[in-house]
Amino acid sequence: MGAGCCVDRWCLVAERAVPSAVVVLLLPVGDDDAGLSKWPDYDRAVLVYSMSVSVDGYIADRDGAFGWTAPSDELFAFHLARVRELGAHLCGRRLYETMLPWETDPSLRDTELGAEFADVWSALPKVVFSRTLDSVQGNARLADSSVAEGVATALGATDRDVEIGGAGLAAAAIGLGLVDELRIFRIPIVVGGGTPYLPPVTEDIPLDLIETRTFGLRVIYERYQRVHADSD
């Protein structure tokens, strides 16, 4: 949810490939029970980059593994409520392929919440940025424009938040100054290298910390809003 995007790139799928990675799901809760904050109240849709991140800033370790991002029941409920609120998801090939089993694998619907998540994810409009894919499935389409144009189109088509992931695509959007919020699920582990959550930047990007939350003794949620030049 993948690591955080979604349900940690989503570890719930990784469970199939790495049985020790996670145990799925959980308690039916509504959006209020999941504790989603509606603040700040933007007057437009915003672009969000959300992932689970190690203490030293990585979304996957040096072997490409991210089983350590496996969510608790409480955290998965929060992720599920978040995805319900999205208007679209922009993703790269790897994240798209990681999440595709939610649309194609009937065994992921074995539980009530598994089926619920599969329905929510399948219905979510997705734009896939890839130089190698010739086609995509379900409610997804291949991007036929630049990242900037794709983001503008997605934001213009909804009044809900739009999420972007994995790291390469998000890095391009950050470099273009397009990401409005960073939502980090900080996992208490140091992995020493791997895929960084954030790219190198050539100029400082000022942020406001607008929300924090803890999930048990393991995860800290950090929500940052980019400070725009015209902010007070």
Model-found features: residue ranges?
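Enzymes that bind and transform nitrogen-containing heteroaromatic metabolites
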Residues: M1-D232
